[in-house]
Structure formats: structure tokens, C-alpha cells
Amino acid sequence: VTRVIGFGILALAAAMAPGQTTAQEESAVVVPSGMPVIFYDSLWDSASSTERFRFLAPRIGGDMPMDFAAVSPDMQHLCDSFALPRLGGRDKLPALIVISLMAEPVAFGDPAPGIPQYFEAYSPKGGICAWEAF
């Protein structure tokens, strides 16, 4: 599994460069629901030809979490407008794109039962993400 990090510890960088945007702010992604979503990382699994894009979405957790039905359109949007454009330069597209939202950072593969996580799978077809039963 190959990992690309999009989120990191930014306090020192922010303190050293006041008035400049941080990498975290630059990785914020606008979604239809309007909830704050930040690109966290992507993981390539060559064995299954799957690219996973993971996003931090704090509002799916907490006291009044957004449910799966409310954020499902966001996941489609993230696949179509965030994931696919980042795969465009490859000779071969992955067979499957998995979009995941997590309320807090979670190590890949960790079930973390106390942290809400939502997942959807898509196949890249004709320039769009086609939903796949997961």
C-alpha cells in the first residue's frame, strides 16, 4: 500500500508564517452539505487496483452527528471532483476508488469502533464515479 499524506502537524508552520494559509486550510474541500471536509491522505493498493481517498469530517461525530444519508452526496462529489482529477495523469485508472470520511484521524485498517467512519466505493467510468455496492 502506497500512502500520500495531505494532513499533518501545522502549528509550528502557522506560528512561523502568520497570515499565510496552512496546508490543512489548503486541503479543505467544499462539499454539497457544506460541512467542513479536509483531505487526509490517499492510499494505493496495487494488489486490488484500489485507490482510497480519506477525508477528515468532524461533523459526522460529536453530539449531533450528520448521518450517512446526509453525507452520501458529499462522497459522490468527492469522488467526481476530487479523486478523479487526481488520477487523470495515470496510464491506467484503478478498478475501484474508495472514499472514506472519518470524524477523527484513524490509522488505516484500524476499526476504531468509537470513531464514526463512512465508506463508499466507486468505479471510474467515462469521466465519472459510478457507485458500487460495497
What are these regions (language model features)?
Residues R54-V98:
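Mature extracytoplasmic domains of secretory-pathway proteins
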Residues A13, L43-D45, A69, G89:
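Generic marker of residues within folded, mature protein domains
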Residues K92-F134:
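Polar/charged, Gly/Pro-rich intrinsically disordered segments
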Residues V1-V4:
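Positively charged n-region of N-terminal signal peptides that target proteins for export
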Residues G19-E51, R59-G61, A133:
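N-proximal, solvent-exposed amphipathic alpha-helical segments enriched in charged/polar residues
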Residues G6-A15:
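Bacterial N-terminal signal peptides
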